[in-house]
Amino acid sequence: YYVDNQPVVGERRIDGAWYYFNESGIMATGITVQTDRPDKVYYYDEDGKMHYGWKELDGKQYYFHPTLGVMLKGAERNIDGVWYYFNEDGVMATGWTNHHNHTYYYQNDGHMTYGEKYIDGYWYYFHERTGVMATGWAKHHDHTYYYQSNGHMYYGEKHLGNYWYYFKKGIGVMATGWTVQSEKPGKQYYYNDRGQMQYGWQAIGNDAYYFDKVYGVMKPYTFKNSNGYWLAYDRNGNLVKDLRSAFNNESSYVIKVNKPMNTVTVYMQYGDGSYTVPLVAFICSTGASTPTGTFYTPDKWRWLRMMGPSWGQWVTQISGDYLFHSVYYNSTNNNNSLSVSAYNNLG
C-alpha cells in the first residue's frame, strides 16, 4: 500500500479498517507481532483487516480485544456475561486451570464452572461468585462441608483444630444433632450446632445423656430427672438400677448410707458437679455404732487382713476402723476360700 508513492509501514486505517504493514511495506495476514509492540499479538484476516473477538486457530480458541484487536493472554475476560480464561499463549482454557493462586475448572466451551461439580469420580465445589475451587470449610445449599487440599469433598470423621467432626457418607454434609455414623451402626453420637462432637453429660430437651469422654459414643441410657436425681432408663423405657458396668472408671463418687433401711446408694457426678446420678444401691449391715456425717475415703485395698484372721476384698476406709468391704474370706487372693456362713453374711 502506497501513499505519495511511498510504501506504508506500520498500522494504517483504510476505509474504516486497520491494517499493518511490516518494515518492507508488506501487508500482514495471520498472527502478527508488531515491531514496535513486541509483547502484543494481533491477527489479520486474509484481506489484511485486523480481527476482533473469537478466532479458532489449529483447533484452539483465541480472543482478540473487541476494540484494540490485541490477543488476550494470561487473563480472565467476561464475554457476553460469561467468564473465560486465556493462558499465557492466548489459548482459551478448558478443564483444570490454575491462575491468580487459585484453582478453577472451565467447561469444554470455556465457561467458568460454579457450584458443585462431579469430576472423574469426585465432588468439588466452586465458589458461586468467583469460581474458585473450595478447600477447607465451605457453606452452600444451607449446609456445611469440608474439602481436602485437592478439592475432594470429605466424608467420614475428621479431626480439625481441637474437635472431631463427621461428614455424612455419600453427601458430605457436616453432621449436627443426633447422628449414627454409617461406618459404626448402632452407636449414637451428638454434634452441636457447630458440628463438634460432644462428650460427657449433655442436656438435650428435657432429658440428659452421657457420651464417652474419649470416643463420644452415647451410653445406651436416657436420664430423667426425678426429685432432683437423674434416673437411668434403657432403650425400652425400663428403669436401670445398676450402672456399674457402664460407668466403672469415674474419678469420684458419693456414697450415702440409709441406716433405717440398711441400704447403701452410690452416686456419680452429673454435669453440673452435683452427685445426683444413682449408680447402684445394695443392702448393708448397719447399727448404732455406724458413724454419721460426711467422710472422705482416705484409703482403699484390693485385699485387707481383718479379724479372725480373715480377709476382705475391695476394702474402702470410711473413717478410723469403719470400712466398706466384701464378706470375709479364709485366705487372701482366693475367691474359693469363702465359707458358707460368710456367704450368708453381709460384709
What are these regions (language model features)?
Residues 23, 46, 88, 314-317, ...:
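Active-site scaffold segments
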